[in-house]
Curated annotation (Swiss-Prot):
GO cellular component term of the entry, any: nucleus
Domain of life the protein comes from: Eukaryota
Region (Acetyl-CoA-binding domain): 353-585
Xref: CDD domains: CD_CDY, crotonase-like
Record key words, sorted: Acyltransferase, Chromosome, Differentiation, Lyase, Methylation, Nucleus, Phosphoprotein, Repressor, Spermatogenesis, Transcription, Transcription regulation, Transferase
Written domain comment of the UniProt record: The chromo domain recognizes and binds histone H3K9me3, histone H3K27me2 and histone H3K27me3. The acetyl-CoA-binding domain mediates crotonyl-coA hydratase activity. The acetyl-CoA-binding domain is required for recruitment to sites of DNA double strand breaks and for binding to poly (ADP ribose) moieties.
Residues of the Chromo domain: 55-115
Tissue expression summary: Expressed in the brain, with expression in the hippocampal dentate gyrus, CA1, striatum and cortex (at protein level). Expressed in the prelimbic cortex.
A single BP term in Gene Ontology: negative regulation of peptidyl-lysine crotonylation
Protein name according to UniProt: Chromodomain Y-like protein
Positions with biased composition (Polar residues): 1-10, 132-143
Its EC number(s): 4.2.1.-, 2.3.1.-
Assembly description: Forms multimers and multimerization is required for stable binding to chromatin. Interacts with HDAC1 and HDAC2 via its C-terminal acetyl-CoA-binding domain. Interacts with EZH2, EED, SUZ12, REST, EHMT1 and EHMT2. Part of a complex containing at least CDYL, REST, WIZ, SETB1, EHMT1 and EHMT2. Part of a complex containing at least CDYL, MIER1, MIER2, HDAC1 and HDAC2. Interacts with CHAF1A and CHAF1B; bridging the CAF-1 complex to the MCM2-7 (MCM) complex. Interacts with MCM3 and MCM5; bridging the CAF-1 complex to the MCM2-7 (MCM) complex. Recruited to Xist RNA-coated X chromosome.
């Protein structure tokens, strides 16, 4: 019944008043039909029917929040059934505090009963423990200093047992009724949480430890390289993995024991069919095999074990983003690899050198990533860098440390590393796209013409100050620079070390296109995905046709340049020039 409805005057008065300052519309058509219209001469005057309605409230059934956030109560009227209940705003019930308090008390009791029932359904033993603890705490609060001994102790113990048994008897029928309830008919949906471990690539061999126990710092400093001396570990199967998260009973879903050499093909198969994890991939050494044995029987909780002689080195926090969720990201230390749909993304992020400088370790990792991309289903490779610098060329500090030991032998090793690195770019059959996000210096700029498309950030700049370094050019720049920008501009860059802005490099042909810094990444990814949607055979054949007459010439130029570097680095004058350059850099800093 609404507030505008009239009630028989023979009803007994209740100690509840219903105040209304303005007319309250009633939506229920049945109430309007049954109500006697109230005649009000003045719109501001409350009708006698409304004034008399304060005696007609029987109880409050429910409450809610309206669109404006105000509380409304569902009122049960005397002489009417539940179909005639109406929602009334709280300000109309200011004198019905007795009914409101009664409703709130019943509402709170129902909530407590529901919470206790859920706890009992999950574990009845926990409920019994809870009632025992609460009873014990109540007794202890009564007289916390008194020691309960003798008959007093016995009587209180019996009291606790009686309370527990009474609770058990009362809760047993309700639990039985719940078990017999048809969940399908009741519309209740049971959501089973998905294990966060399921589908997540394991980056190292940890033994049955839940992810909540892992220290955040330790997780960030994980270095994924696993040596052949890695101890025997236990891997969890899908069933046991779910059991560890509490979503399923523990099931010993056995992973077949693998004893003896594990080849790369076997590890790939295990990873694909879902019965293996990435420790197989991580445990592969350079020769492609490693002895490892796995079993899920007798799994015990333990700490993560990291076996890496370089784990004491600081981990670059710039890598704490989604690339570390991919399996290939854990194979390298100085680069990050993302295997995406149709292409492979290689990012320079060196730990063993500063500003993404190149030393033999970084070069080997880039070569390994390119070899993997050449063999898989990637249509092209995107090469970029993490941070504000693309590549600062060779790591001269690394070279100086080794040249002081055995100059002739170390100079040969370093020249050979550069030769293999450059040849990898020359011989790579799939398109290589470079996204230059910052300065590209020395070898970092020389390899750009060996790639197929170069996109640059507006803030990037390019320089090859080889004479300042005290070395001869590298990266086939003696051939590619004159072909791209002409002899005069090439000599200006290679001899005098002229610095080119991104726009100047684009005008000379070293860069294909320049993008605004704010949208650089988005522009690159849009164009990469367009290229990745093309036919891979068309892409490879197109590159082969463009490079067919240059491959042998580039390999010969690379050989000549490395021989010159070997000669310079093996001489005392070359060492002095390099030391002078480093000293100038230190003074400038």
């Amino acid at each position: 019944m609404g507030l505008g409805s009239s009630q028989p005057s023979t009803k007994e008065a209740e100690p509840c008043t219903l105040q209304e300052k303005e007319e309250h519309p009633v939506d229920d058509t049945r109430q309007q039909n049954n109500a006697v219209p109230a005649t009000v001469s003045d719109p501001d005057q409350v009708s006698p029917a409304v004034q008399d309605a304060e005696t007609q409230v029987e109880s409050i059934v429910d409450k809610r929040k309206n669109k404006k956030g105000k509380t409304e109560y569902l009122v049960r009227w005397k002489g009417y059934d539940s179909e005639d209940d109406t929602w009334e705003p709280e300000q109309h019930l200011v004198n019905c505090e007795e009914y409101i308090h009664d409703f709130n008390r019943r509402h709170n009791e129902r909530q407590k009963e529901g919470t206790l029932a859920r706890a009992n359904r999950a574990s009845p033993s926990n409920a019994r423990k809870q009632i025992s603890r609460s009873t014990h705490s109540a007794l202890s609060k009564t007289n916390p200093k008194a020691l309960v001994v003798g008959k007093d102790h016995e009587s209180k113990t019996n009291q606790l047992l009686a309370t527990s048994q009474k609770f058990r008897k009362n809760t047993a029928p309700s639990l039985a009724n719940r078990k017999n309830m048809d969940l399908a008919k009741s519309g209740i949906k049971i959501l089973v949480p998905k294990s966060p471990i399921k589908g997540r690539t394991s980056i190292d061999g940890f033994h049955g430890e839940s992810p909540e126990k892992l220290d955040q710092g330790a997780e960030d400093t994980v270095t994924p390289e696993v040596t052949a001396e890695k101890p025997t570990g236990a891997l969890l199967g899908p069933g046991a993995e779910r059991a560890r998260m509490g979503s399923r009973p523990r099931i010993h879903s056995l992973v077949p024991q693998v004893s003896g050499p594990v080849t790369a093909a076997m590890a790939t198969t295990l990873a694909v069919n879902g019965k293996g994890t990435s420790p197989f991939m991580d445990a592969l050494t350079a020769n492609g095999t490693v002895t490892i044995q796995t079993s899920v029987t007798g799994v015990t909780a333990g700490k993560r074990k990291f076996i890496d002689d370089r784990r004491d080195q600081p981990f670059d926090k710039r890598l704490r983003f989604s690339v570390r969720q991919t399996e290939s990201a854990y194979r390298y230390r100085d680069i990050v690899v993302r295997k995406q749909d149709g292409f492979t993304h290689i990012l320079l992020s060196t730990k063993s050198s500063e500003n993404n400088s190149l030393n033999p370790e970084v070069m080997k990792e880039v070569q390994s990533a390119l070899s993997t991309a050449a063999a898989d289903d990637s249509k092209l490779v995107l090469l970029s860098a993490v941070g504000s610098v693309f590549c600062c060329g060779l790591d001269f500090i690394y070279f100086i440390r080794r040249l002081t030991d055995d100059r002739k032998r170390e100079s040969t090793k370093m020249a050979e590393a550069i030769r293999n690195f450059v040849n990898t770019f020359i011989q790579f059959k799939k398109p290589i796209i470079v996204a230059v996000n910052g300065p590209a210096i020395g070898l970092g700029a020389s390899i750009l013409p060996l790639c197929d498309v170069v996109w640059a950030n507006e803030k990037a700049w390019f320089q090859t100050p080889y004479t300042t370094f005290g070395q001869s050019p590298d990266g086939c720049s003696t051939v590619m620079f004159p072909k791209i920008m002409g002899g005069a501009s090439a000599n200006e860059m290679l001899l005098s070390g002229r610095k080119l802005t991104a726009q100047e490099a684009c005008g000379k042909g070293l860069v294909s296109q320049v993008f605004w810094p704010g949208t650089f990444t988005q522009e690159v990814m849009v164009r990469i995905k367009e290229l990745a949607s093309c036919n891979p055979i068309v892409l490879e054949e197109s590159k082969a046709l463009v490079r067919c007459n240059m491959k042998m010439e580039l390999e010969q130029a690379n050989e000549r340049e490395c021989d010159a570097l070997k000669k310079i680095w093996g001489s005392a004058q070359g060492m002095d020039s390099m030391l002078k350059y480093l000293q100038r850099k230190i003074d400038e800093f």
